[in-house]
């Protein structure tokens, strides 16, 4: 397992700079999605990063690692995979298929991003 399946609680909700720091340094979990042909659930999540004062919050955010986690019908973890770094859009640029996941390839830090067309990877689960 690459990351903990929980995120730390933010210590100060009244200070926006602490909230931003918390958002970058902690794991972020996305919605759980269902793949009906496999009777499995899939969830993407971002790993946290250390704050580097030489980089913008945007650059730090786009450099986070994206993970794919699979769950069985009782939500037991059956797999976790580290996806290609600096490749995918972290703002809901994906959708489930009946037997996999489609993820758009448009990370701002990628030199291969084609903004004139759509590029994506399909991760099929067997």
Where are these regions (language model features)?
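Surface-exposed loop and turn segments in beta-propeller and other repeat-based domains
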Residues: 1-24, 81-89
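Short secondary-structure capping micro-motifs at structural edges
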Residues: 14-21, 26-33, 52-58
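Recurrent small/Gly-Pro-centered beta-turn motifs in extracellular repeat architectures
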Residues: 44-47, 105-107
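Residue-level recognition of short loop/turn positions
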Residues: 37-38, 74
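Beta-propeller blade signature
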Residues: 56-76, 115-126
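Beta-rich catalytic cores
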Residues: 28, 64, 89-90
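Structural signature of eukaryotic scaffold interfaces centered on beta-propeller domains
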Residues: 24-37, 94-98, 102-103, 107
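Blade-level signature of beta-propeller repeat domains, shared across WD40, Kelch, NHL, RCC1
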Residues: 98-126
């Amino acid at each position: 397992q690459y990351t903990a399946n929980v995120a730390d609680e933010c210590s100060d909700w009244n200070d926006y700079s602490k909230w931003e720091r918390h958002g970058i340094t902690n794991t972020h979990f996305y919605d759980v999605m269902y793949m009906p042909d496999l009777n499995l659930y899939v969830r993407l999540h971002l790993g946290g990063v250390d704050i580097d004062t030489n980089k913008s919050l945007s650059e730090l955010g786009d450099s986070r690692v994206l993970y794919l986690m699979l769950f069985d019908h009782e939500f037991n973890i059956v797999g976790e995979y580290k996806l290609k770094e600096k490749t995918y859009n972290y703002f809901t640029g994906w959708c489930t298929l009946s037997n996999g996941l489609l993820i758009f390839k448009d990370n701002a830090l990628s030199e291969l991003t084609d903004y004139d067309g759509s590029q994506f990877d399909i991760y099929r689960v067997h």
